[in-house]
Amino acid sequence: MTTQLEQAWELAKQRFAAVGIDVEEALRQLDRLPVSMHCWQGDDVAGFENPEGSLTGGIQSTGNYPGKARNATELRADLEQALRLIPGPKRLNLHAIYLESDTPVARDQIKPEHFKNWVEWAKANRLGLDFNPTCFSHPLSADGFTLSHPDAKIRQFWIDHCKASRRVSAYFGEQLGTPSVMNIWIPDGMKDITVDRLAPRQRLLEALDEVISEKFDPAHHIDAVESKLFGIGAESYTVGSNEFYMGYATSRQTALCLDAGHFHPTEVISDKISAAMLYVPRLLLHVSRPVRWDSDHVVLLDDETQAIASEIVRHNLFDRVHIGLDFFDASINRVAAWVIGTRNMKKALLRALLEPTDQLRQLEASGDYTVRLALLEEQKSLPWQAVWEMYCQRHDTPTGSQWLDSVRTYEKEILSKRS
């Protein structure tokens, strides 16, 4: 430990103690909050089923920065490089298209055995795993419908895919001793004016009920459902709207997924957390950064990321909120994207843990909004960075921007050699 870091740490402890905050306790609490990193940043959502296929479903990964992972070995190596540079507990979020098999596997036939390498790797790296059925980038999703498809055979294919995915998710939880959160997002919708908005939603309701009909131990598997406002090619109507999934999660008591980019640009998910928690048992968060639309830019340490973290901490939702990331930027170094976004999420959580929330709540209850605002602003100037650097030091990860040296070396020695 450097003398400079030690000095900054001691001063920070004193400054935060003066406002009633125990920084050691804050770091202990931070170690209770894993962040689930998304595997698809590493290869632009290509997967291993058909890596040369097109990304569909109304989502886009833009850019052509060299060095993207081309197979599972490369993707896991890239993830390991990122993991070494991020302090504290982490998880990995997988999509079904990241299966491994010597022969083609239909999506409705995926099995736990196709993900055994991921499980062994997760064990070696002390990670939990989360999962997602992949209801896009497939011939049977080409017309814009999956679980709400009017063709019963196609609809059943996607139902069976989601059911098979739940078995994979439960396998993750059994093997790793931590529940896998499996999130269902579908791209279903229409480009233009839609006459019958009810029938697709009725089909989706019935399909989801069939999907979740098999019971699993919640210690192994948790179901989540995710809404979206619109997608490219589905601008006018989205079957799985916010109202649909809020109703579904409430009535079926599944988890509800809130994606930061899946709402109108004037809406923020930080304001939805407390409302949803009154009705659903759990929330899954997809922290992202929408720029004018669901662009999935790399997460910043901005006001909304901080507000999301503050909602979790202020209301002690550690055991009911699952924090995941969802962005994919192909215009920058993909390992760096993981590191930047995940470290920013953890910084936001730390800053929230260093807030004198009880004092602020008392001021609010007494109607002293002047002091509430003043203290919230003064809080921003307290030396949280020194606490963060100590956290990095204790987890044997680089402080400040030192992690960039490791990424540059990895790019020169590994990524630059990929064609």
Curated annotation (Swiss-Prot):
What GO terms in the biological process aspect are recorded for it? L-lyxose metabolic process; rhamnose catabolic process
**Under the GO molecular function aspect, what terms does this record hold?**
L-rhamnose isomerase activity; manganese ion binding
Which superkingdom? Answer: Bacteria
* Main location per the UniProt record: cytoplasm
**Keywords, in A-Z order:** Cytoplasm, Isomerase, Manganese, Metal-binding, Rhamnose metabolism
Q: In which pathway does it act?
A: Carbohydrate degradation; L-rhamnose degradation; glycerone phosphate from L-rhamnose: step 1/3
Indicate whether Manganese appears among the record's keywords: yes
Describe its function. Answer: Catalyzes the interconversion of L-rhamnose and L-rhamnulose.
- What protein is this chain from? L-rhamnose isomerase
Its source organism is Salmonella enteritidis PT4 (strain P125109)
Q: Which gene encodes it?
A: rhaA
